[in-house]
């Protein structure tokens, strides 16, 4: 695996205003995620497509798609998500190298797992692992075989 950026998140005080800004500036397709608020743990979330997607929601040409969400704390900055094959392994490796876990391994149901960390300089980043079974019964963060958490 290349360990490339696979997703980004932009926090906004007024997500609707930010969505309008990016739509008009770059022509991005931005739509409120169906799992938002009611099914997304109360978090308001918009999917941002900077490039077209295929039937699975993956970019159909080079580019990175992401999300836009309501800012949850003052000073919250954009976060890049780096794809890995084994999230648990990379969280352990990052900690050995001096990273701090800010949000432990968490599922995005039917999509994958993520953890947010800060690097040795205090920059926030996230690690992402695709897994269509994430969040399913028996597949919560503490129940997956080999889980570091």
Q: How would you label these PLM feature ranges?
A:
Residues 2, 9-62:
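Core segments of cupin and vicinal oxygen chelate
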Residues 1-20, 25, 77-82, 129-149:
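N-terminal beta-strand motif that seeds the catalytic metal site of vicinal oxygen chelate
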Residues 18-22, 94, 122:
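Conserved active-site tyrosine of GNAT-family acetyltransferases
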Residues 38-44, 74-76, 108-113:
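Short acidic/glycine-enriched loop/turn segments that link adjacent beta-strands
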């Amino acid at each position: 695996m290349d360990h490339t950026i696979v997703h980004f998140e932009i926090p906004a005080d007024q997500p609707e205003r930010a969505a309008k800004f990016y739509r008009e500036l770059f022509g991005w397709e931005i739509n409120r995620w169906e799992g938002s608020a009611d099914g997304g743990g109360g978090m308001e979330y918009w999917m941002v497509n900077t490039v077209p997607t295929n039937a699975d929601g993956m970019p159909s040409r080079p580019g990175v798609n992401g999300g836009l969400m309501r800012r949850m704390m003052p000073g919250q900055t954009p976060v890049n998500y780096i794809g890995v094959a084994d999230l648990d392994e990379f969280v352990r490796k990052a900690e050995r190298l001096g990273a701090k876990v800010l949000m432990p391994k968490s599922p995005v149901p039917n999509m994958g797992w993520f953890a947010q960390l800060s690097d040795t300089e205090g920059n926030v980043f996230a690690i992402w692992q695709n897994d269509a079974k994430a969040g399913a019964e028996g597949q919560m963060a503490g129940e997956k075989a080999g889980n570091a958490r």
